[in-house]
Amino acid sequence: MNTTKFVAVLAAAALVACSDTEVGPTAPERDALAAANGPAVASASGGGRMVLEVFGFTIPQVLGFSARRHADGSASGHINYRQTFEGETFHFVATVTCMAIYDGNRVKYGGVLTRSNDPTVPVGDYMWFQSIDNGEGEGSPADVSTGSGFGSEAENEAFCASPESPDPIFLAEVIGDIQVRE
């Protein structure tokens, strides 16, 4: 990871860490979850800042996530996401319920919202993302991610289960880092 990416990841982590809301399960809760579901057979994590330019809108976002798929097929982890739209900042926290890796470097993950300050997307709804790890080092293109999708549990599970690649219009460069491991 180059120095610029490393500093950006640290800055994003500091923003998430300084949040006044919880970002996911505590270390003992994560350990208990991993023990109950078996070892992770695949994982993805990372985040950073993104700016999505879509349909004439500029939407600044901060994403941080950790997702694991376990030997029994279940998924665990957390997602912490902020987006600013037309001057209002929305913050969402979710517990990961699905995760799948495609093409070796592309991860789809989603989960149930445990925190939301957006009255149109309440706790109990689901959100999902697709992120691409484009490698490390000088000359590697930036990692990219979609903005969030929101909907029902069935839509969340269908999203993770579909190998379909993201529409490039919904991808933004991540100023940070995404790691995908199988």
Predicted regions and their residues:
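Predominantly extracellular/secreted and cell-surface proteins with exposed
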Residues: 50, 56-132
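Bacterial lipoprotein signal-peptidase II cleavage site
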Residues: 19-26
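C-terminal partner/receptor-binding element of secreted or periplasmic proteins
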Residues: 139-182
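Post-signal peptide N-terminal segment of mature Sec-exported envelope proteins
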Residues: 27-45
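C-terminal motif of bacterial Sec signal peptides marking the signal peptidase cleavage site
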Residues: 15-17
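Sequence contexts marking disulfide-bonded cysteines in secreted/extracellular proteins
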Residues: 19, 97-99, 157-163
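Extended soluble regions of mature proteins
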Residues: 119-122, 128-152
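Bacterial N-terminal signal peptides that target proteins for export
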Residues: 1-8
